[in-house]
UniProtKB/Swiss-Prot annotation:
Residues 175-185 have a biased composition (Low complexity). Interacts with R-SMAD daf-8 and co-SMAD daf-3. Interacts with daf-3 in a daf-8 dependent manner. It holds the Pfam family MH2. GO terms for biological process: anatomical structure morphogenesis; BMP signaling pathway; cell differentiation; dauer larval development; determination of adult lifespan; egg-laying behavior; negative regulation of dauer larval development; pigment accumulation. It comes from the Eukaryota. Keywords: Transcription, Transcription regulation. The gene is daf-14. PROSITE patterns: MH2. SUPFAM superfamilies: SMAD/FHA domain (SSF49879). GO terms for molecular function: DNA-binding transcription factor activity, RNA polymerase II-specific; I-SMAD binding; RNA polymerase II cis-regulatory region sequence-specific DNA binding. The keyword ATP-binding does not apply. This is Smad-related protein daf-14. It comes from Caenorhabditis elegans. Residues 168-187 are annotated as: Disordered. Probably an atypical receptor-regulated SMAD (R-SMAD) that is an intracellular signal transducer and transcriptional modulator activated by TGF-beta-like daf-7 signaling. Plays a role in TGF-beta-like daf-7 signaling in regulating entry into a developmentally arrested larval state known as dauer, in response to harsh environmental conditions; partially redundant with R-SMAD daf-8.
Amino acid sequence: MSNEQEDFGSLFNNQGELGIMDDFAEFGFQTTTTPTNWAAAGNYMYPDQVHLPASINNPNMPINDWLEDAPMPDCYNVPSTSTDENNDPFPFSNISSQSSLKPKTPEKAVVEVRPTGNEMLDPEPKYPKEEKPWCTIFYYELTVRLGKAFEAKVPTITIDGATGASDECRMSLTSQPSSRNSKSSQIRNTVGAGIQLAYENGELWLTVLTDQIVFVQCPFLNQTLNKPLKYVFRLQNKGDQKRMKIFDKEQFEQEKTLALGPLTEKEVADERMRIFSNIRVSFCKGFGETYSRLKVVNLPCWIEIILHEPADEYDTVFRINNERPEIGSRS
């Protein structure tokens, strides 16, 4: 018999039962024959220096009683759950039989984690991000702003005079409060299909759908066409006159470059950028130098469109220009 076999054989007593090594005596344990049901350990090697309570060898105390008051692991520490369900000190002794352990899980999972390909697991729940509006529209009668602001979050919207409440794709002028001005009410009732705004790939297009004439004041468009910033366009639902591009991001980037350029150019570009985010549309009634009403605030029914992207860009440019040191002088 080899030395290895002799060492392994010394673990058993004369009856072939697994005994406790003499090395345990220094820990205050009695070296006596263990219960016969431990023989089911088979070829499992006994762990070195295992701290076993002396009560485990007491023939008058069941082997399971010594763990009766032992704290359970956190994953099984469920209120009103008996610790007897997990009290076997050496679970491998019953490896051949099906375990009676029935761990309890919460009734509702707080976070559900699922693998997503090669990406790392993210334990935080994900919620769809709220889509930001690309423009805000206000309704006016003369100088009075009425109703709630309309925020456009979908690429294409309409502003019309049809009945019914507004929704994410449509702003209804008839659903807005009225200033009780008879002219305003009359115009609102004739707006009909109104206008359409379509914003895609950095371009904003306005299309006339109503049979009425629409007047548009767009400083950015006037700048690109070398017209006075207060110039007013007259559109109607006929041929080429019904559709017009009123904003272009690429053109706007060029103006932003000027605003960040030398001081002499920056002073002019700053003022222009400030109004490039504003578009004013009047229904039925015109205004401007060729009309009796010079300003849009003299009209009974009109809307103001605020484009968020150029407005945010202006805020950024304005902050940068005010933070950096200026070279030159203002006169």
